[in-house]
Amino acid sequence: MNNILNFYPAVITTDVAENWQIGFQDPATPIMEGIINLHYDLMFFICVISVFVSWMLGRTLWHFEQNQNKIPSSLTHGTLIEMIWTVTPAFILLIIAVPSFSLLYAMDEIISPAITIKTLGHQWYWSYEYSDYLNEDDDSINYDSYMIPEEDLEIGQFRLLEVDNRMVIPINTHIRVIVTAADVLHSWAVPSFRSKCDAIPGRLNQTSLFIKREGVYYGQCSEICGINHGFMPIVVEATSLPNYVSWISNKLNE
């Protein structure tokens, strides 16, 4: 039960970076969906502005080329045009700012979490603690997550991304992840969640998750933390609530 979704086809359950990928991974949280939608909205403005500026530059170079225009223009001031190129960009920035501010607010909002998971970064592995659950000895669920060496990988597993113990969470549940570090700076990052939370020794940072679909999601430490920085991947397994409860029960009985 440690890796609940191993029997599903990898193409369905894995959200992982691909070779030569330049776009986003498939979103698994409402926040990531909002970020992607905002990106597409901004790209519209970027394309329109880029085409307009390129046209203006080309038109200027063509009409004011030395061989065609021996006498340079003496225009030094134009109130109307100056108002236009001041007010128009300000209006565009305002249109862009409103949805981005609401998204930034939502990214920092922690909504009545049902589960709290503590994440601790080490050189060079992650530790997870589920302090909401205690066994008969009042011990919480606590385990380390190391990268699987390349020679131990099974067919279909991803090089430099697989771990021996995944972080397991339920879908459609508000989750709080508390992140810190034991030695140097780390960063807990999973692209499909839009999550990137710095792990700082002596400080607790937090982020929230609300996963909408089952799957296995891959991330990596995103803060240079030493010689093996590239060898501390993150794997999050999102499963149904009954499977999650079963996994918790097995962990408590170990």
Curated annotation (Swiss-Prot):
Its EC number is 7.1.1.9. It catalyses: 4 Fe(II)-[cytochrome c] + O2 + 8 H(+)(in) = 4 Fe(III)-[cytochrome c] + 2 H2O + 4 H(+)(out). It is an enzyme of class 7 (translocase). Its main location: mitochondrion. CDD domains: CcO_II_C. Cu cation A1 binds at H186, C221, C225, M232. Its cofactor is Cu cation. Residues 1-37, 105-254 are mitochondrial intermembrane. Mg(2+) binds at E223. Residues 59-83 are mitochondrial matrix. GO terms for molecular function: copper ion binding; cytochrome-c oxidase activity. It is a multi-pass membrane protein. Component of the cytochrome c oxidase, the last enzyme in the mitochondrial electron transport chain which drives oxidative phosphorylation. The respiratory chain contains 3 multisubunit complexes succinate dehydrogenase (complex II, CII), ubiquinol-cytochrome c oxidoreductase (cytochrome b-c1 complex, complex III, CIII) and cytochrome c oxidase (complex IV, CIV), that cooperate to transfer electrons derived from NADH and succinate to molecular oxygen, creating an electrochemical gradient over the inner membrane that drives transmembrane transport and the ATP synthase. Belongs to the cytochrome c oxidase subunit 2 family. Component of the cytochrome c oxidase (complex IV, CIV), a multisubunit enzyme composed of a catalytic core of 3 subunits and several supernumerary subunits. The complex exists as a monomer or a dimer and forms supercomplexes (SCs) in the inner mitochondrial membrane with ubiquinol-cytochrome c oxidoreductase (cytochrome b-c1 complex, complex III, CIII). This is Cytochrome c oxidase subunit 2. It comes from Chondrus crispus.
